A protein has these predicted regions:
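Short hydrophobic/aromatic-rich motifs at helix boundaries and adjacent loops
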Residues: 5-8, 41-45, 70-74
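General beta-strand structural signal in soluble alpha/beta enzymes
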Residues: 7, 53, 86-87, 115
Length: 124
């Protein structure tokens, strides 16, 4: 490991919340998670250099597979473009996304990464 990597903070949505009943979809929760998570650690979207999303079943339950692109839609600051990728590893998707971000930070490619793990499993 060439440099130390730190997790600055985190945010977790309410598991009991019924998204459909509250007229929310995957993107609404994603956007809220980005902004609330950054606020929790006193960062702004402009501080993020790379983004990783862990997700297992968005294609099946939400008809959406390309979740890295959600960053661009979640804040105008991201319109300038940041590298963003989605990682799928069943129940370990969020962990794999974290490991991918960690590897980029260890290499010195980036100084600050955002990692989001998100699921909406409607029929399980």
């Amino acid at each position: 490991m060439s440099s130390k990597v730190y997790i600055l903070g985190g945010y977790q949505t309410d598991f009991a919340q019924n998204w459909a009943r509250n007229e929310l979809d995957l993107f609404d929760v994603f956007k809220d998670t980005v902004h609330t998570g950054l606020n929790e650690v006193n960062l702004e979207p402009k501080d993020i250099e790379v983004a990783h999303v862990g997700n297992f079943t968005a294609e099946l339950f939400c008809n959406q597979g390309h979740l890295g692109g959600f960053f661009v839609s979640s804040d105008p600051v991201f319109y300038s473009g940041i590298p963003a990728s989605r990682h799928e590893a069943a129940c370990a998707s969020g962990s794999i996304a974290t490991l991918a971000a960690s590897a980029e930070l260890e290499l010195g490619r980036y100084n600050l990464a955002a990692v989001i793990g998100i699921e909406q499993m409607k029929n399980v």
